């Protein structure tokens, strides 16, 4: 049994905004330290950014506003940008070290999970609006906004479609928050921390990506943990794990693109 939401779900809009701001930080500073939280809904987008990057420059603030409105439309923006905590910054002063305590798990994807991921992308390609999908053995449930029953029935005639009828969805119907759809992003690999709105020094990003990729490659579960400040994980220098995660983020098009669908 698995649930998947698409990139226009309010929670994913929040993740995408957070990812876009992380992308901007990487444009203005090599390997910035950044954490972004987004709460969006009903015409307002609240954003808090903790960062080492110079994002208070007028051109950077404009770029953040432009990214938010590109993703979420015309919306009131409440933006707070503050420096990273000095103790946390000192942890990374001499190279990459784990940015927090954490537990991590990578689990090979099941055929059911791969199937639903493909279905979600297929529907979203035709209907790029808020949607949520569930697959439980042979039972497929499709809740897709801004589409009629007949539209979806043509694609998936045996599915349960919009059980309460047609709907509009989006951030004027439901609020969105960063890292609230980790089951959709990570399947059975969910543990403690979220993937989005963070730089690569954060173990929640790099170790989660590393564990997931290793599980898919080996076909075996992977379980890891770290303490803040660790410089070795799974017998590898943490810097090497960061570079594996960096390559994955780059391969999908950046942090905003990564936030669209998560790990699969």
Can you say where each PLM-predicted feature lies in the sequence?
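A domain-level signal for the structural core that forms small-molecule/cofactor-binding pockets
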Residues: 1-264
């Amino acid at each position: 049994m698995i649930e998947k939401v698409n990139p226009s779900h309010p929670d994913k809009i929040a993740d995408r905004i957070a990812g876009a701001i992380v992308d901007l930080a990487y444009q203005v500073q090599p390997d910035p330290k950044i954490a972004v939280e987004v709460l969006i809904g009903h015409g307002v987008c609240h954003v808090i950014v903790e960062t080492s990057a110079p994002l208070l420059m007028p051109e950077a603030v404009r770029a953040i506003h432009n990214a938010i409105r590109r993703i979420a439309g015309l919306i009131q923006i409440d933006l707070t940008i503050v420096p990273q905590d000095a103790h946390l910054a000192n942890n990374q002063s001499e190279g990459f070290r784990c940015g927090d305590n954490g537990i991590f798990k990578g689990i090979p994807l099941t055929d059911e999970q791969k199937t639903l991921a493909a279905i979600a992308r297929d529907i979203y390609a035709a209907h790029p609006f808020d949607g949520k999908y569930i697959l439980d053995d042979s039972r497929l449930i499709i809740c897709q906004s801004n589409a009629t029953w007949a539209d979806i029935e043509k694609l998936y005639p045996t599915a349960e479609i919009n059980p309460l009828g047609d709907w509009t969805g989006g951030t004027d119907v439901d609020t969105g928050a960063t890292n609230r759809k980790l089951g959709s992003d990570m399947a059975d690999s969910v543990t403690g921390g979220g993937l989005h709105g963070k730089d690569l020094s954060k173990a929640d990003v790099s170790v989660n990506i590393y564990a997931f990729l290793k599980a898919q490659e080996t076909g075996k579960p992977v379980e890891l943990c770290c303490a803040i400040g660790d410089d070795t994980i799974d017998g590898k220098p943490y810097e090497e794990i960061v570079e594996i995660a960096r390559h994955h983020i780059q391969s999908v098009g950046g942090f905003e693109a990564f936030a669209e669908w998560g790990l699969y």
